[in-house]
Curated annotation (Swiss-Prot):
It comes from Escherichia coli O1:K1 / APEC. InterPro entries: Agmatinase, Agmatinase-rel, Ureohydrolase, Ureohydrolase_dom_sf, Ureohydrolase_Mn_BS. This is Agmatinase. Its EC number is 3.5.3.11. The lineage of its organism: Bacteria, Pseudomonadati, Pseudomonadota, Gammaproteobacteria, Enterobacterales. It is an enzyme of class 3 (hydrolase). It holds the Pfam family Arginase. It catalyses: agmatine + H2O = urea + putrescine.
Amino acid sequence: MSTLGHQYDNSLVSNAFGFLRLPMNFQPYDSDADWVITGVPFDMATSGRAGGRHGPAAIRQVSTNLAWEHNRFPWNFDMRERLNVVDCGDLVYAFGDAREMSEKLQAHAEKLLAAGKRMLSFGGDHFVTLPLLRAHAKHFGKMALVHFDAHTDTYANGCEFDHGTMFYTAPKEGLIDPNHSVQIGIRTEFDKDNGFTVLDACQVNDRSVDDIIAQVKQIVGDMPVYLTFDIDCLDPAFAPGTGTPVIGGLTSDRAIKLVRGLKDLNIVGMDVVEVAPAYDQSEITALAAATLALEMLYIQAAKKGE
């Protein structure tokens, strides 16, 4: 099965350059990369406004504005000198075939993880996290989930492909342990009896970052962690370009500080999802997503440099 294309994809949903202008490598499985970036241009599982399939391209495009900074503030070092990161482009699948996307993404992830790589993925709608969790759980065992979102995505509607059901399905499949997982920024209806610790947007906005991070560390412990960031966790003032925006969210400043605070966790996989550039203003949503993705890489580089 061919998981990725091995030539530049000039379609409307892809770019011919990597995130941060990092090297493109269409054969990442045999590379010496520490982290591999994969775009997943998929939005068939959305329940709101479509357009997330263009998210990976938008994130890469705006990331060129971040590529110039070497000793990034406040880290004061260049992530690229500590981590070998490559961008392998976008998952190639038949648009319109959700099952093929899911199977090919899981196979791609399993192959990367078996080769000793770690993954940072760009959605696409949030459903793409489920096949990624399946692959990571095969490699690392049951994981903790640190989940930034306006929605819990724990809804049991019986639909196989729905971006609001992944974290109902994942515990059922034994992929994640809700009792060691935390959902941050929630501000919509949710089930209080599913085992997850929910830190709603009201308390996240009112409490100190240090206090929140201390609680997250206590909940997660030393389990392997999958970190997923739905961009609608941010308030629409900072991230209007998404399918299901909800007011009352986090500022971009608070989100960045929270992500930086996760440095000491055993993070084994990461994604940023739900950027829909058709609804964006001056690329601020894509810029927020690209910046958060960069901060995720920096926390990995900081750990490697210790």
